[in-house]
Amino acid sequence: MPFWVEVRINNLDEGDISALENNFTQNFNNLIDQNKEIIKYIIQKVKTQSYLEGKLHPFYYINLIDTNDLHKPCFLTKFGLKSRFTREEKGYIVIEGHYH
């Protein structure tokens, strides 16, 4: 079963979304840097949940979500996290884990 964790990124607006689309890696890394502590916390929370359920190797997905286009694809990040835009709740980063 997939599971979802959401975290509000208050400064993610349409300009940030546009920049992320146009130059994904650089701008996504900047977004990670700006929110590093909460991103780390959320990733650890997902990993811990998988350990509690006896599943040690989940896949991680980060969705950068906006309201304009519900199914816009994203790109792989250098962190080994597969990302995509779903644009359902503006300003959220969602991490979705799938078990191996």
From Swiss-Prot:
Top-level taxonomic group: Viruses
Protein name (Swiss-Prot/TrEMBL): Protein alpha-2
Organism: Adelaide River virus (ARV)
